[in-house]
Swiss-Prot record:
Catalyzes carboxymethyl transfer from carboxy-S-adenosyl-L-methionine (Cx-SAM) to 5-hydroxyuridine (ho5U) to form 5-carboxymethoxyuridine (cmo5U) at position 34 in tRNAs. Keywords: Transferase, tRNA processing. It holds the Pfam family Methyltransf_9. Homotetramer. NCBIfam families: PRK15068.1, tRNA 5-methoxyuridine(34)/uridine 5-oxyacetic acid(34) synthase CmoB. HAMAP family: tRNA_carboxymethyltr_CmoB (MF_01590). This is tRNA U34 carboxymethyltransferase. It catalyses: carboxy-S-adenosyl-L-methionine + 5-hydroxyuridine(34) in tRNA = 5-carboxymethoxyuridine(34) in tRNA + S-adenosyl-L-homocysteine + H(+). GO terms for molecular function: transferase activity, transferring alkyl or aryl (other than methyl) groups. InterPro entries: CmoB, Mo5U34_MeTrfas-like, SAM-dependent_MTases_sf. The keyword tRNA processing applies. It comes from the Bacteria. Carboxy-S-adenosyl-L-methionine binds at K61, W75, K80, G100, D122, P123, S124, V149, E150, Y169, R284.
Amino acid sequence: MQENLLEKQFLNHPLYAKIQELKALNLACNFSLGDSVNLSTNSQAKDEILAIAKELKPWRKGPFKIDDLFIDTEWQSFIKFNILKPFMNEISQKCVADIGCNNGYYMFKMLEFNPAKLIGFDPSIKYRLQFELINALAKTPIKYELLGVEDLPSYSLKFDVIFCLGVIYHRSDPIKMLKDLKAGLNKNGVVFLDTMYIEDEREIALVPNKTYSKIPNIYFVPSISALKNWCERAGFKEFEVLATKKTDENEQRKTEWIDSFSLENFLDPKDKNLTIEGYEAPKRVYIRIKI
């Protein structure tokens, strides 16, 4: 029912109609990938594209370049993608899901590695509309579902590779989320996951009081040992740390495309190693887990 309701709201959204009008123009478009997702249409319909893009703010993941229009997103998402890029050969000719896919930036980037099928899950109408705007021009075979991680066990397909980036700390039951990821895998499937974490040798997690880095829906920020235990409890047998990285103001920052605050406003102005609440400043661990 939730999917049907979201799908109905999405299809009735006025910007969806505008994107469909743009799509009907069937503009010739050169699609290329660098740090940004690049679309060249010889500036056809540029006024319409700019107007839709502005109405779809905030743009979190990217960047995107459409002719002379540069959508300078809050996150320089190529930084995260480049951390995972050495492992992207694992998606070649595989059935791949991106859970919490936002506007599809990572999926567009994954096309370079020739997945057999690429499906994004995110129950956000705005992010889906951003994806539809880009894909109206790019014309890729990527599929986008207005679904969440909890829908994976009952989904019609199982996946060889699942990406779940920046989701688990938003879940009040992280072990159930990991079990849902596991239930969405084919035999010998693999999950690539990243989360914020705390530096601690103990098997513990930070439970923020009300907000973490001014974000209200952060439930648990685990140590790496605690994260490993979560994965084992969910039934994963292999756990590999691929990288760790502190989030800095080069990777996440305020731009004209978000109309709100960003990382610089979320840290202690006197000590950038702390959040405004006094917790450790955000840093991320990237892992690969297998069943």
